A protein has these predicted regions:
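PLP-dependent enzyme catalytic core of the Aspartate aminotransferase-like
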Residues: 1, 6, 319, 332-363
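A glycine-/small-polar-enriched, mobile loop at the entrance of the PLP active site in fold-type I
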Residues: 5-56
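Conserved N-terminal alpha-helix of the aminotransferase class I/II PLP-enzyme fold
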Residues: 34-81, 88, 103, 111
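PLP-dependent aminotransferase-like
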Residues: 79-145
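Active-site phosphate-binding strand-loop segment of PLP-dependent enzymes
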Residues: 112, 124-179
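Conserved active-site segment immediately N-terminal to the catalytic lysine
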Residues: 172, 186-197
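Active-site C-terminal subdomain of aminotransferase-like
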Residues: 196-277, 291, 361-363
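Conserved PLP-binding catalytic core of the aspartate aminotransferase-like
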Residues: 286-316
Length: 363
């Protein structure tokens, strides 16, 4: 199959805009007449420093990042933040609040327990992580050093539709699977972070946006590469950053601006998700897994109710160019990730394929 015949519904690493890949391919051997690939450039070279500064400025503009916050381009994946956050924001004996609404928030809370007292402010685990708690369900600790939540749960297909009110306690949010898909008031957050491999760039880059007031209080035992203050002081270049991924993020941000920015993405994501959810709600074979009020626009989870039929559908879809629809091993079923670069045509093809499969099963 050719690229135009395939739609990639992977939860991450995920689909990138074809236009971005074409630009990267054209510049691969000779970036802007430098005679070098970006892959070969010194991170201290003028060429790369210009790429770095431009990408940072584009992200600041795209998310309207206030001057109180610093943008960091880090390594280690979003999972490294599970440790980095408590090491930098707490002292031994401090209390923190965690909302456990999915697998990754659960892992983050367990990791934080190594460093401080974790209070579970909310959990949907008993319900199979199929819903997001309402504000009035949150049990908040007034002495908490921060409140942590994961905005979009890729595995279970749920998303927070609101920013929690915490009474002034700094909010830390994992936005890995929804960043750049809608406007965000960054000023409400102490830390926003995201692994880039879902909506931003290839795997290998982690973006952290931090209120500078929260930095500089890390524990003495904090590894030097895990100090927010050190990375702020060195402008993310204490060591060699993931240079090519930063360049790719810049290209994605150029593409994003042409699509109307995050406001344009919000309209697109809602329209794409509606196409799929509308079909799921009328289907006699397939059904959605998440509670309607908590449904994610980025990751749509669904199943038939029979594991064998689910597997048959995944194979049926693959033969028609629809890739990576198998659900996460923790949840099973199917999952369609509708990130920014997924065109509406891909969702329409998926719905058509689901209808064809359903008709064959005479339901």
């Amino acid at each position: 199959m050719n690229r135009e015949d395939v739609f990639n519904f992977s939860a991450g690493p995920s689909v990138l805009p074809t236009e971005v890949l074409q630009t990267a391919a054209a510049e691969l051997l000779n970036y802007h007449g430098s005679g070098l690939s970006v892959m070969e450039m010194s991170h201290r070279s003028r060429e790369f420093m210009d790429i770095f500064a431009a990408t940072k400025a584009k992200l600041k503009k795209a998310l309207s990042v206030p001057d109180t916050h610093e943008i960091l381009f880090l390594q280690g994946g979003a999972s490294l933040q599970f440790s980095m956050i408590p090491l930098n924001l707490t002292a031994e004996g401090d209390t923190v609040d965690y909302a456990v609404t999915g697998n990754f928030a659960n892992i983050a809370a367990k990791e934080a327990e190594k460093y401080c007292r974790v209070h579970i402010a909310a959990s949907s685990e008993a319900a199979g992580f199929d819903r997001i708690p309402a504000q009035e369900e949150l049990s908040l600790s007034p002495e908490a050093k921060y409140f942590y939540y994961c905005a979009n749960n890729t595995i279970f297909g749920t998303a927070w539709k609101y920013v929690p009110e915490t009474g002034g306690v700094p909010i830390v949010c994992d936005m890995s699977s929804e960043i750049l898909s809608h406007p965000v008031d960054v000023s409400k957050f102490g830390i926003v972070y995201a692994g880039a491999q879902k909506n931003m760039a290839p795997a290998g880059l982690t973006v952290v946006i931090i209120d500078r007031a929260l930095a500089g209080h890390e524990r003495a035992v904090t590894p030097l590469m895990m100090s927010y203050q050190r990375m702020i002081d060195k402008d993310s270049m204490y060591n060699t950053p993931p240079c090519y991924n930063i360049y790719m993020l810049g290209l994605v941000l150029d593409w994003l601006e042409k699509q109307g920015g995050v406001a344009g993405m919000e309209k697109r994501k809602s329209a794409k998700a509606k196409l799929l959810y509308d079909y799921l709600d009328e289907s006699a074979l397939f059904h959605g897994c998440a509670e309607r009020a908590s449904r994610s626009d980025m990751n749509v989870t669904f199943r038939t109710g029979d594991a064998g039929t689910d597997a048959e559908f995944v194979k049926f879809s693959l033969e028609r160019g629809l890739r990576n629809l198998k659900g996460h091993r923790v949840a099973g079923g199917m999952r369609a990730s509708l990130y920014n670069a997924m065109p509406e045509e891909g969702v329409l093809r998926l719905v058509e394929t689901m209808k064809e499969f359903e008709a064959k099963h005479h339901v």
